[in-house]
Design a protein with these regions (language model features):
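TRNA-recognition modules of translation machinery and tRNA-sensing kinases, especially anticodon-binding
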Residues: 1-171
Length: 171
């Protein structure tokens, strides 16, 4: 999914003969359900609620140590596998979905479109959601939604057959 090798230092490695890691996000196991699959029908929609593990704890600074970044946290992940022609439409609907949750919770939020320098190398377009924390007097990222286009599908060999029977990469 693009976590390795770039983010290896932020992951928890399990000691042993094989290179195993605790999951940094449910995106990793969820997308791997579709490794080497040829999709027959779109969209595929998944959600997962998992504990996640990252070494980035405390990266917000000592004034909020232990409040914003923890080594273990629970996270909800939404993943969609889509036809390339519909991937940006799907991204827009996922943005609306996350915004509707924040609206229901009546939380003040803003949506930021990340610039090229802030995107992960695997993402074509990402929107971050930030909620205002009155206690810290700052905006805190609470969600992000991305379109990876064919990046993850290429690594996963996640494909579909087009109208001519030719194998293509999903988004």
């Amino acid at each position: 999914t693009g976590q390795l090798p770039k983010f290896e230092e932020d992951l928890f490695k399990v000691p042993g003969e094989r290179d195993l890691y605790l999951i940094p996000t449910a995106e990793v196991p969820v997308t791997n359900f579709f490794r080497d699959v040829i999709v027959k029908e779109f969209p595929i929609m998944c959600t997962a609620y998992t504990p996640c593990f990252r070494r980035e704890a405390g990266s917000y600074g000592k004034e909020v140590r232990g409040l914003n970044r923890l080594h273990q946290f629970d996270k909800v992940e939404i993943v969609q596998v889509q036809h390339p022609e519909k991937s940006y439409e799907t991204l827009d609907s996922m943005v609306i979905h996350v915004a509707s949750i924040l609206d229901e919770l009546e939380l003040p939020y803003k949506i930021l479109q990340l610039c090229g320098g802030d995107l992960s190398f695997s993402s074509a377009l990402t929107f971050d959601f930030e909620v205002y924390s009155a206690g810290q007097e700052r905006w805190l990222e609470v969600s992000s939604v991305s379109n990876f286009e064919s990046y993850q599908a290429n690594r996963l060999k996640l494909r579909y057959k087009d109208e001519n029977g030719k194998t293509q990469l999903c988004h």
